């Protein structure tokens, strides 16, 4: 992890860097971070993460985040690209104090779309648990079996779209920002936002890798500005 100098109006930035260039089958990656009371931080990656084809074992990623009272945490990595044959198991566990705020995004691209690669074989599971004051606020499990075509190609799955993203805002006033995103995305398919319970806003996107990234960037700018009280722009690492 590197700590580049933030812009004058930004929170401290932590850059998560994989010096190996990617993850292979059998690799295990664990990250833990705690923000104390009233602290602010933005966590980003400097580039897309790559998960290579596996010869059998899963790649395992575990992220554990904790935010104390009045803390504001942004988890904003760039895309994770699953090469054909990759096997990724990922877990995210976030614990928030009563008035802590969280903005989190995760984007998955199935196959190296720039090389016209299709994700024909492989496995992906994504496990989210979000806690507020020790009580479960949100739980989500996504599992893509091997072979993945029956989910990726199905009309009630990804409908042959190669990319998907999740956006999470946990804040006491989360519902106030739903209509801002709906207005931004009102003429677009494959993008939706909802408030499943008080204090939680969820966005879901599917589409091409380019369209999904554009939608995530739009949401990040809106939510960083209005919900996280930050600058009206993307993190600098997203632009480098």
Swiss-Prot record:
GO terms for molecular function: nickel cation binding. The keyword Cytoplasm applies. Keywords: Chaperone, Cytoplasm, Nickel insertion. It is found in: Cytoplasm. One of its GO terms (cellular component) is cytoplasm. Pfam families: UreD (PF01774). UreD, UreF and UreG form a complex that acts as a GTP-hydrolysis-dependent molecular chaperone, activating the urease apoprotein by helping to assemble the nickel containing metallocenter of UreC. The UreE protein probably delivers the nickel. This is Urease accessory protein UreD. HAMAP family: UreD. Belongs to the UreD family. Disulfide bonds: none annotated. The keyword Chaperone applies. InterPro entries: UreD. The gene is ureD. Coiled coil: none annotated. Required for maturation of urease via the functional incorporation of the urease nickel metallocenter.
């Amino acid at each position: 992890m590197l700590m580049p100098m933030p812009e004058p109006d930004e929170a401290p930035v932590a850059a998560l860097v994989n010096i190996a260039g990617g993850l292979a089958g059998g690799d295990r990656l664990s990250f833990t971070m705690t923000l104390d009371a009233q602290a602010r931080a933005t966590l980003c990656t400097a580039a897309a993460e790559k998960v290579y084809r596996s010869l059998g074992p899963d790649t395992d990623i575990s992220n554990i985040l904790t935010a104390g009272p009045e803390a504001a945490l942004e988890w904003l990595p760039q895309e994770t690209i699953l090469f054909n044959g990759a096997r990724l198991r990922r877990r995210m566990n976030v614990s928030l104090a009563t008035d802590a705020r969280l903005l989190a995004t995760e984007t998955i691209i199935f196959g190296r779309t720039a090389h016209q690669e299709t994700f024909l074989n492989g496995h992906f599971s994504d496990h989210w648990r979000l806690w507020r004051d020790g009580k479960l606020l949100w739980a989500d499990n996504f599992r893509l079996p091997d072979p993945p075509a029956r989910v990726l190609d199905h009309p009630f799955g990804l409908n042959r779209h190669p990319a998907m993203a999740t956006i999470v805002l946990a804040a006491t006033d989360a519902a106030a920002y739903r209509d801002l995103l709906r207005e931004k995305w009102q003429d677009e398919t494959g993008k939706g936002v909802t408030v499943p319970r008080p204090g939680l806003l969820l966005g879901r996107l599917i589409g091409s890798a380019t369209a999904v990234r554009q939608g995530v960037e739009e949401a990040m700018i809106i939510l960083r500005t209005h919900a996280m009280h930050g600058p009206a722009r993307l993190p600098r690492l997203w632009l480098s």
